[in-house]
Regions:
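An N-terminal assembly and electron-transfer interface module characteristic of large anaerobic redox
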Residues: 1-426
Length: 426
């Protein structure tokens, strides 16, 4: 991990590998996470996960290592932490993850846990920030759980959805929408690891006939490992955004799977889209088309690329659409004029902000704050975390057909806000 990436994750985004691992483990009901490290790392990881997963404050705990632990080892700290979890009496399994510093000590964490002899299985791994950012930590935790899977008899017409996370912005709602779409097409969803699936459901994952990867940075390593171990084919399909984009996503998935039927389901969604777009046409007759001088989309790859494509192909007109990706991807977006990778092209990204004139920003609070500090005009709504100045309380997703309605609504409200600002300035 480069110095730039480490400083970005540890000091600004609060989303290092430790956080990613904790997010995956804590998403499994009945699981407790023991972070073997100082309270600093624990509070940052726990708070980030707890913002979206209400169990985190109860199921993530910490050994609270001291400087002397770096000299004498962390055995006593681990034993105390396991004792607290045992006394709570709610754990079904425990995951122990080392932070950066304790991972360098070389303690036999697995041996210490086995010697403790708790009433539940214990799984161990190193996952500090030096091991990577959130995505790497999440993916490594997923792989650790794949190690526990056993061969299962294949269930025809079934899939796992890999790469979902309930700590992404609207992550839980997106997971529910993906399950709704697939089940509406007659596809049996075995598991969605990282997004609400139980341990039993995840252990049944090898019975799926196919793995659909919706976020490469989170799910692709596990998909490759499951193909190797259980001969389950996989495909990277991204997340669906927009009305037309979601329809094309369904058709693409069914073509890949060669099972499922979508005609009836898509007919119902077409009616939903027609009614929503009718309302948009009414606004357009009053205020004109959805035009923005510039558009900036900054988010993880699946969100950024999918939403950018839906924006330009379905809803808005703009002179320039720029994407800032928060992690690497092999995918691209024909609708974008410029695509940059955060931490790899920071000088170009700095110039993008300095040269910004006005327009629509779809991002997290980090990007909008940066524009505010430069006194740049813009309208915005958030599609990624952190979101410090915008609340999300409804059960609507950002992805899929139901998510398209929310995005279209927010785009129109942003345009109306921009029109109101222009009238005030005149």
């Amino acid at each position: 991990m480069s110095k730039c990436e480490f400083e970005s994750s540890c000091h600004h985004n609060d989303t290092c590998g430790l956080t990613g691992s904790a997010a995956f483990f804590a998403s499994i009901p009945g699981s407790f996470v023991l972070i073997n490290g100082p309270l600093w790392c624990y509070f940052y990881a726990m708070k980030y996960v707890d913002d979206e997963n209400g169990r985190a404050a109860r199921c993530i705990t910490c050994t609270g290592t001291s400087p002397s632990s770096m000299v004498y080892g962390t055995e006593k700290d681990i034993l105390k932490g396991l004792s607290r979890i045992r006394d709570a009496g709610q754990a079904e399994r425990v995951f122990i993850e080392n932070n950066c510093s304790t991972g360098l000590i070389g303690d036999d964490v697995k041996g210490i846990a086995e010697a403790f002899g708790g009433p539940w299985p214990v799984y161990t791994m190193d996952s500090g920030g030096l091991k990577g950012r959130f995505e790497e930590g999440f993916a490594r935790a997923f792989l650790r759980v794949v190690e526990e899977m056993k061969e299962e008899k294949t269930i025809p017409g079934s899939v796992n959805v890999l790469g979902l996370s309930d700590v992404y912005l609207k992550g839980r709602e997106d997971g529910e929408e993906i399950r709704r779409i697939l089940r509406g097409c007659g596809i049996n969803v075995i598991s969605t690891p990282g997004c609400g699936s139980s341990w039993e459901e995840i252990m049944k994952a090898p019975s799926a006939a196919f793995n659909l990867v919706v976020r490469d940075e989170l799910g692709l390593p596990a998909a490759r490992e499951m193909e190797k171990r259980f001969h389950i084919p996989y495909a990277s399909v991204g997340l669906p955004y927009g009305f037309e984009g979601s329809r094309k996503w369904v058709e693409k998935v069914l073509e890949i799977l060669a099972f499922g039927k979508a005609d009836s389901f898509l007919d119902k969604e077409k009616e939903r889209a027609r009614e929503i777009l009718r309302k948009g046409n009414g606004l357009e007759s009053l205020w004109g088309s959805l035009w923005f001088d510039e558009v900036l989309v900054a988010a993880p790859p699946s969100e950024a690329l999918g939403i950018a494509e839906a924006l330009r192909s379905e809803w808005i007109d703009t002179a320039k659409l720029t994407i800032h990706l928060l992690s690497p991807t092999d995918r691209t977006c024909q609708a974008a004029d410029i695509i940059r990778l955060v931490t790899a092209e920071d000088e170009d990204i700095r110039r993008d902000y300095e040269n910004w004139k006005d327009g629509l920003v779809l991002s997290s609070s980090h990007e909008t704050t940066r524009l505010e500090r430069l006194h740049k005009p813009f309208v915005s709504f958030h599609i990624a975390r952190p979101s410090y100045d915008e609340g999300f309380f409804s059960d609507l997703p950002l992805s899929g057909f139901r998510g398209a309605a929310l995005l279209y609504e927010k785009i129109w409200n942003a345009r109306l806000k921009e029109i109101g600002r222009e009238k005030i300035l005149k």
